[in-house]
């Protein structure tokens, strides 16, 4: 399955809209987009998962790595548009306490 990825550069953050299934086969596509953003370290990153129908632990691992890299530059990762099902992954793993995870598509 292919992953649909749209990126928008705002003045103070990058917005990444993701659609499809985020798993071991598709995470490398998203990683190609996120790695340069986290290496640059000049903007927060907002990842919108509203159109993601499935995500496994590989996706969680990518977000943990992105968060760590951004935090080194005093920047943050915001995971937005999280469905109830995907939200449970963040809850069960305790990652919801470490990063900004929101069911809405805007940063609160």
Swiss-Prot record:
Description of post-translational modifications: Phosphorylated by RsbW on a serine residue.
Xref: InterPro entries: Anti-sigma_ant, STAS_dom, STAS_dom_sf
Domain STAS: 3-108
Modified residues (Phosphoserine): 57
Keyword annotations from UniProtKB, A to Z: Phosphoprotein
Highest taxon, organism lineage: Bacteria
GO terms assigned for molecular function: anti-sigma factor antagonist activity
UniProt similarity note: Belongs to the anti-sigma-factor antagonist family.
NCBIfam families: ant_ant_sig
Biological role: Positive regulator of sigma-B activity. Non-phosphorylated RsbV binds to RsbW, preventing its association with sigma-B. When phosphorylated, releases RsbW, which is then free to complex with and inactivate sigma-B.
Name listed for the protein in its UniProt record: Anti-sigma-B factor antagonist
Organism: Staphylococcus epidermidis (strain ATCC 35984 / DSM 28319 / BCRC 17069 / CCUG 31568 / BM 3577 / RP62A)
């Amino acid at each position: 399955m292919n992953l649909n990825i749209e990126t928008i550069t705002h003045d103070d953050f990058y917005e990444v809209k993701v659609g499809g299934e985020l798993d071991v086969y598709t995470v490398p596509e998203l990683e190609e987009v996120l790695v340069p953003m986290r290496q640059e370290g000049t903007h927060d990153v907002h990842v919108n998962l509203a159109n993601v129908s499935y995500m496994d632990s590989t996706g969680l691992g990518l977000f943990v790595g992105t968060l760590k890299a951004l935090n080194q530059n005093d920047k943050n990762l915001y995971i937005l548009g999280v469905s109830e099902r995907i939200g449970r992954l963040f809850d069960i793993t305790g990652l919801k306490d470490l990063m900004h995870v929101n069911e809405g598509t805007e940063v609160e």
